[in-house]
A protein has these predicted regions:
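Extended ligand-binding regions for polar small-molecule ligands
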Residues: 2-16, 48-60, 118-121, 125, ...
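Extracytoplasmic small-molecule ligand-binding "clamshell" domains
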Residues: 4-91, 96, 228-231, 240
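Short loop->beta-strand "edge-of-pocket" segments that line small-molecule binding or catalytic clefts
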Residues: 24-30, 47, 125-142, 154-155
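Periplasmic-binding protein-like
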Residues: 31, 108-118, 180, 184-226, ...
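Ligand-binding cleft/hinge of the Venus flytrap
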Residues: 37-41, 54-64, 103, 128-130, ...
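Short helix-initiation/N-cap motifs at beta->coil->alpha
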Residues: 51, 67-78, 121-122, 156-167, ...
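A ligand-binding cleft/hinge motif common to bilobed small-molecule-binding domains
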Residues: 74, 91-99, 145-148, 166-201
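Flexible hinge/capping segments at coil-to-helix
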Residues: 106, 115-133
Length: 253
């Protein structure tokens, strides 16, 4: 899915050439993370804090914006790696940092586990046991993190993060891992589930640009994100989009 919006004449020609060599700023938008983006029920267009940030960046660069919407974090990374997008919105992760220059985080999101009401699991430390199966969104921040941290439990990769709870149910898995907001929505919808009380990780959501675009592009994007946090832009966008449970990252987070 793509969507383009017009803009004014280039406000920063040198940066516009780095970020948008094809003319438009192609922003990869991950619809698999409801904290970052959703589809507007009235228009069907992507909306959310990631869309707002992309829109403002394109405005400052003076180039049109093209939204490249995908269903998973893995797809969003592929867009960057395959030159299908110029910028994206990602959880900071060492593996991804091999190809992507990350800004500081603009939002912190908490990762939680969910289990069935009758599960004997009551705490995070009980998850990494032999015989425990953990559903994660393939290529998501949870997948990358838990692939490093879980040594006894078995990770079961579901195609997209929004499908994790359904996969957890359909495959009779032990645990579902994901964004707290998504898990809460799904638990309320299907019933018979509870979310463990403590988060297992904090996800640092940042903007990213291909490393091939160079240090100047990376520095410009990093400065843009810091300004958007300090000005209240990110907080206002989260509030406008009704996002709860995500907090604006502070400098140095």
């Amino acid at each position: 899915m793509t969507q383009a919006t017009p803009s004014s004449a280039p406000a920063n020609p040198s940066m516009a050439a780095l970020f948008a060599p094809h003319g438009a700023l192609r922003a990869s938008i991950n619809l698999g993370n409801p904290v970052l983006a959703n589809l507007d029920p009235k228009t069907g267009a992507p909306v959310g804090v990631s869309v707002d940030l992309a829109t403002e960046l394109a405005r400052r660069l003076g180039v049109p914006l093209q939204l490249v919407a995908v269903k998973s974090a893995g797809n969003s990374v592929e867009n960057i790696e395959q030159d299908k997008a110029d910028i994206g919105f990602f959880a900071v992760d060492p593996k991804r940092a091999q190809e992507i220059s990350f800004t500081g985080p603009y939002v912190l999101i908490e990762g939680f586990y969910a289990v069935r009401n009758d599960s004997p699991i009551t705490a995070n430390e009980q998850v990494d046991k032999a015989g425990i199966t953990v559903a994660v969104g393939k290529g998501s921040a949870y997948d990358l993190f838990l692939s490093r941290e879980l040594h006894q439990a078995t990770i079961v990769r579901i195609p997209t993060s929004p499908a994790v709870v359904q996969g957890f149910i359909d495959q009779n898995l032990s645990v579902a891992a994901g964004v707290k907001q998504q898990l809460e929505q799904d638990a309320a919808r299907v019933g018979g589930m509870r979310i463990l009380p403590q988060r297992f990780m904090v996800i640092r959501q940042a903007m990213g640009v291909p490393k091939a675009r160079g240090d100047a592009a990376a520095a410009y994007l990093a400065g843009f994100v810091e300004e958007m946090k300090a000005s209240g832009f990110v907080a206002a966008s989260l509030a406008k989009n009704g996002i709860e449970g995500a907090i604006v990252a502070k400098a140095g987070d």
